Amino acid sequence: MAHGAMGTTATDTNMNTKTMPTEPTTTVAFDPGTFERLHRAYRRIDPGDPAQAWHLLEALHVLGQTRLVPHARTHGLMLALAWRTRNLAEVNGQLLRLLLVPLGHLLGRLPLGNTGRSHVGAFRPMQVAPELLATIRAHQRPPTL
């Protein structure tokens, strides 16, 4: 395991780099099923409701940011939404973040809990907002008995 200023890096059996928190930042454990259910919910969003689309993408980012592929995939979706909504500041922010994702995973320096949007510092760890946590939990599969 390598240690970075914002977390500890390890590799799981799927060869996905993951970062585990070492600071008091609230994080959400990655679950591929929950990630895919959130992604499906995002794809079903009404194109005329960008606020809900951004909310789901922020939830996807918080959930997937400790894994390289889901993290990059989420920033790609954010870039596409920024382009569709003609938000040039967000387009530029997402282009920068897409370049930083591999480097952050390689160095194990990911700002856990960060929502991934351009109006938030790219290196700023954050507490997970209660509404994002509620959205993530709503898409978790209930335990089977």
Where is each model-derived feature located?
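TPR repeat positional signature
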Residues: 37-38, 71, 75-78
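Internal catalytic or translocation cores that form aromatic/hydrophobic pockets or channels
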Residues: 78-85
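N-terminal alpha-helical interaction modules that lie
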Residues: 2-7, 11, 15-65, 85-145
